[in-house]
């Protein structure tokens, strides 16, 4: 694998997108629900606060902890994508490109939304 600036940028964007997909996106909620449960409580001011309760023990609890931590998930996503690049480079290149484009599109959308609100 050749490591250059473009590779680092593409991998970074791909890891960003994959980690957000796993930790935050609604489409992955059914997967996350296998490992943790979201609880809601009202605080003293009447605001609803959501917190996560990890399910199970052992591997299940480990995955639940992982999926509740964006930074932790990002490290594992980076490892997964680098391993894919080493083992199945052709398929990994397409996956990384797809995730990188989606990640950059998400960043652009956030910036444009904030810009339009001002």
Curated annotation (Swiss-Prot):
InterPro entries in UniProt: Mycophage_PG1_Gp7 (IPR010773)
Ranges annotated as spanning the membrane: 8-28, 62-82, 92-112
GO biological process terms, semicolon-separated: sporulation resulting in formation of a cellular spore
Keyword Lipoprotein attached: no
Keyword ATP-binding set for record: no
Localization, UniProt: Cell membrane
GO CC terms: plasma membrane
Membrane topology of the entry: Multi-pass membrane protein
Keywords (A to Z) from UniProt: Cell membrane, Membrane, Sporulation, Transmembrane, Transmembrane helix
Main subcellular localisation: membrane
Pfam families: DUF1360
Origin: domain of life: Bacteria
Family stated for the protein in its record: Belongs to the UPF0713 family.
Role this protein plays: Involved in sporulation.
Protein name, per record: Sporulation protein YjcA
Source species taxonomy: Bacteria, Bacillati, Bacillota, Bacilli, Bacillales
């Amino acid at each position: 694998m050749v490591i250059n600036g473009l590779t680092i940028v593409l991998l970074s964007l791909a890891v960003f997108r994959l980690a957000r997909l796993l930790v935050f996106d609604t489409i992955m909620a059914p997967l996350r629900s296998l490992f943790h449960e979201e609880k809601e409580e009202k605080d003293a001011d009447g605001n609803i606060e959501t917190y996560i309760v990890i399910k199970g023990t052992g591997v299940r609890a480990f995955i639940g902890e992982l999926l509740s931590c964006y930074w932790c998930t990002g490290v594992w996503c980076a490892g997964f994508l680098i391993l894919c690049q080493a083992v199945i480079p052709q398929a990994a290149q397409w996956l990384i490109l797809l995730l990188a484009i989606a990640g950059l599109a998400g960043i652009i959308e956030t910036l444009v939304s904030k810009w339009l609100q001002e």
